């Protein structure tokens, strides 16, 4: 057996022993030893193999799967720029705490700095954005290699899963030719793993008791939920009388403490003067809304963070305590505190939805509400990082039976189609995505599925306003910048999304009437795109009218 084949087979076997069941492969020549080993393992039913020809898409597909399963997913590529194209997914996984195991093939040392083809410096390619980097030595037919290879896989898998907060790890693998199996199975030592399929090295600590917050003691507190932990946060808030707000509004929250219009209420200075919390307990990375950042930067508010690991977010540098879970009771709650938030939520919600009913269809908030209302129970909803996540938070009805996925680690729009497909494959139930046109087009390669690849049951709703609608709501969209806005912020593209879908063999529907929308969203098998065309010129006015309606309901 040639050394590269032996190494690849051992690495794949030990990955399976460490619980890896999902692998995404981008094809190439230098990673051929891994490709053969992965194909054999998939044929034997030991793992599910997904093949993608675009490495960026492959990385985000793996990220989507890992986000839903919370188990390490492996992504494999060849050398050169193939490896650099995984960097956006690695960045997202780093800041969101998603367990990825990145295996990059490389040239052996004698071909580096020598002008060899498809060769770059891959040593620590992803810098500080991986929990572990290791470059394995070039494989040799000598005793001790089996134990070395298996030990390093266990080390990487343990770091990806994380004792407190998992994330991406990177193994760089220099393969020397020959790169294809020779048919000869002779080796200088047995290449078997431990008996009964056990890991080569068991790492204690991944299942130890999580740390808990000890300084939760306010009678007037808020819980702010980003991604993950919505169920436990909802239960904790209801038990102790703390209102629970989310960056996805009422979608994913449950219980009597859930405040579906929380992002609107935080935006009302008059309301917040009377309802300023003493403590805010943040769950995850709350990064979308400026009103949230203003609250967290308030020197009169103590901020606690339920978030494992060292990469906890604190832009205002004022977090009082960080732990993995909420901890014990904060003590007796102010009996009027939660009631005040609940009553405000009821008033704001009634005014908001009455105002939405008056808006002309389609626009972002109205479409977001319609999508959420149409979701079957138990659905997955993937949200694009620009307007869709904001539209759902500001306009959707309360849906505790829906699971939300967002790429909010670094909040880029790249890879969202691929991440949605990965999340849908792992979810196994009805799955939907709500994306803007730029987010969709940025990762349209994600629609490229080979005939032997798994196809998700996923409906992608694209709100197409021909450009960057998010900027209409920011300072750049104010009237004094009208002369430059369209060229450098609006960025119209004129792309025919239907033709693009047809090129990939993906079903596409354009919905022009609201009465058609519910029918188009009915659950059906397979991958499809539902396009809704909107005018972003009206978006700023829509948000101003909704804000005025909520403000009027609470302040007259």
UniProtKB/Swiss-Prot annotation:
Give me the comment on cofactor binding: Binds 1 thiamine pyrophosphate per subunit.
- Any keyword Signal? no
Please name the InterPro entries in this protein's record: MenaQ_synth_MenD (IPR004433), THDP-binding (IPR029061), Thiamin_PyroP_enz_TPP-bd_dom (IPR012001), TPP_enzyme_TPP-bd (IPR011766)
| Family to which this protein belongs | Belongs to the TPP enzyme family. MenD subfamily.
The record's NCBIfam families line, in alphabetical order, gives: menD
Task: Cite the PANTHER family for this sequence.
Answer: 2-SUCCINYL-5-ENOLPYRUVYL-6-HYDROXY-3-CYCLOHEXENE-1-CARBOXYLATE SYNTHASE, PROTEIN PHYLLO, CHLOROPLASTIC
> Could you identify this protein by its name?
2-succinyl-5-enolpyruvyl-6-hydroxy-3-cyclohexene-1-carboxylate synthase
Q: Which organism is it from?
A: Saccharopolyspora erythraea (strain ATCC 11635 / DSM 40517 / JCM 4748 / NBRC 13426 / NCIMB 8594 / NRRL 2338)
Q: Which gene specifies this protein's sequence? A: menD
């Amino acid at each position: 057996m040639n050394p590269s084949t032996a190494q690849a087979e051992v690495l794949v076997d030990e990955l399976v022993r460490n619980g890896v069941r999902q692998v995404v492969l981008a094809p190439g020549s230098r990673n051929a030893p891994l490709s053969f080993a992965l194909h054999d393992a998939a044929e034997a039913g030991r793992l599910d193999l997904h093949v993608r020809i675009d490495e960026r898409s492959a990385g985000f597909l793996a990220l989507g799967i890992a986000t839903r399963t919370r188990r390490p997913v492996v992504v494999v590529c060849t050398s050169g720029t193939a490896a650099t194209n995984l960097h956006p997914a690695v960045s997202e996984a780093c800041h969101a705490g998603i367990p990825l195991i990145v295996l990059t093939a490389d040239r052996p040392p004698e071909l580096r700095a020598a002008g060899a083809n498809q060769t770059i410096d891959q040593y620590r390619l992803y810098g500080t954005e991986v929990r572990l980097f290791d470059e394995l030595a070039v494989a040799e037919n000598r005793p001790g290699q089996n134990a070395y290879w298996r030990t390093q896989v266990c080390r990487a898998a343990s770091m990806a899963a994380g004792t407190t907060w998992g994330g991406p790890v990177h193994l760089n693998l220099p393969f020397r030719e020959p790169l294809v199996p020779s048919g000869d199975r002779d080796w200088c030592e047995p290449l078997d793993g431990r008996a009964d399929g056990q890991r080569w090295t068991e790492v204690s600590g991944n299942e130890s008791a999580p740390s808990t917050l000890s300084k939760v003691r306010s009678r007037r507190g808020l819980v702010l939920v980003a991604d993950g932990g919505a169920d436990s946060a909802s239960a904790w808030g209801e038990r102790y009388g703390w209102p629970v707000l989310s960056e996805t509004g009422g979608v994913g929250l449950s219980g009597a403490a859930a405040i579906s219009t929380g992002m609107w209420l935080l935006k009302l200075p008059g309301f917040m003067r009377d309802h300023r919390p003493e403590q805010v307990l943040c769950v995850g990375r709350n990064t979308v809304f400026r009103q949230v950042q203003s609250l967290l930067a308030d020197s009169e508010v103590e901020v606690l963070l339920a978030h494992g690991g060292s990469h906890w977010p604190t832009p205002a540098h004022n977090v009082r305590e960080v732990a993995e879970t909420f901890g014990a009771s904060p003590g007796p709650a102010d009996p009027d505190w939660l009631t005040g938030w609940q009553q405000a939520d009821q008033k704001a919600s009634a005014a908001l939805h009455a105002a939405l009913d008056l808006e002309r269809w389609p626009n972002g908030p109205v479409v977001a509400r319609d999508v959420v209302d149409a979701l079957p129970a138990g659905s997955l909803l993937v949200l694009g990082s620009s307007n869709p996540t904001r539209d759902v938070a500001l306009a959707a009805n309360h849906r505790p039976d829906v699971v939300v996925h967002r790429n909010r680690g670094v909040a880029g729009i790249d890879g969202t189609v691929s991440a949605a497909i990965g999340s849908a494959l792992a979810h196994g139930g009805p799955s939907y995505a709500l994306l803007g046109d730029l987010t969709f087009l940025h990762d349209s390669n994600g629609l490229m599925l080979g005939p032997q690849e798994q196809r998700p049951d996923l409906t992608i709703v694209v709100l197409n306003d021909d450009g960057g609608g998010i900027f209409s709501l920011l300072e750049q969209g104010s009237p004094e910048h009208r002369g430059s806005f369209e060229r450098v912020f609006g960025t119209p593209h004129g792309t025919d999304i239907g033709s693009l879908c047809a090129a990939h063999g993906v079903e596409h529907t354009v919905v022009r009437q609201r009465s058609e929308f519910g029918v188009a969203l009915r659950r059906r098998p397979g991958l499809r795109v539902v396009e809704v065309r909107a005018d972003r010129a009206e978006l700023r006015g829509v948000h101003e009218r909704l804000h005025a309606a909520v403000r009027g309901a609470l302040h007259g």
